[in-house]
From Swiss-Prot:
CC per GO annotation: cytoplasm
Record-level GO BP terms: protein folding; protein-containing complex assembly; urea metabolic process
Matches recorded under SUPFAM superfamilies: Urease metallochaperone UreE, C-terminal domain (SSF69737), Urease metallochaperone UreE, N-terminal domain (SSF69287)
Its job: Involved in urease metallocenter assembly. Binds nickel. Probably functions as a nickel donor during metallocenter assembly.
HAMAP family on file: UreE (MF_00822)
Signal peptide: none
Similarity comment: family membership: Belongs to the UreE family.
Pfam families: UreE_C, UreE_N
InterPro entries, per database record: UreE, UreE_C_dom, UreE_N, UreE_N_sf
Magnesium listed as a keyword: no
One term of GO molecular function: nickel cation binding
Protein name as annotated: Urease accessory protein UreE
NCBIfam families documented for this protein: PRK13261.1-1 (NF009751), PRK14113.1 (NF010711)
Length: 152
């Protein structure tokens, strides 16, 4: 089994494999899974720092594994104006729900009450599977790792 104890922001070296994980799994500090090429892997990283899509993991034997996001069921609310978008974000934030915020759209785990709230402010809500990369919170540091490896 491959074992990971080290995270890299980026690398110029060749990526050996990848691992595709949903948001709930990326939050864990101890993960037992299978890479995209089928290798068993154990990931042991610092608690409180979720794995980020694009981040590079280094195995004990030196292989580099890229973290990828798995599409999952999410609700995406899209606004036509900044005022109603801001109001919806405010109310969703007051509910301490996990949010991914984009330009005039906000994404959250499916919840009919939250979907109705967004619709009440004129946002259109759709439920299409997507990679969920929520904000870490007011006191979390958010930085996306990246590699310079390119898909073949």
């Amino acid at each position: 089994m491959l074992q990971v104890f080290e995270r890299l922001d980026h690398t110029h070296d060749e990526i050996s494999d990848s691992i595709t994980l949903d948001q709930d799994t990326r939050k864990k500090s101890r993960i037992k899974s299978v890479t995209d090429k089928g290798a068993n892997i154990g990931i042991f990283v610092e608690r409180g720092h979720p794995l980020l899509v694009g981040e590079i993991l280094k195995t004990e034997c030196g292989l580099l594994i890229e973290v990828k996001g798995k599409a999952e069921d999410v609700s995406t609310a899209v606004a036509n104006d900044w005022l109603n978008f801001s109001k919806v974000c405010y109310h969703l934030g007051n509910r301490h729900t996990t949010l991914q915020i984009g330009e005039l759209w906000v994404r959250f785990k499916p919840d009919h009450v939250l979907e109705q709230l967004a619709e009440n402010y004129g946002l259109s809500v759709n439920s299409i599977p997507a990679v969920f990369e929520p904000e870490n919170g007011a006191y979390g540091v958010r930085s996306h790792g990246h590699s310079h490896a390119h898909d073949s």
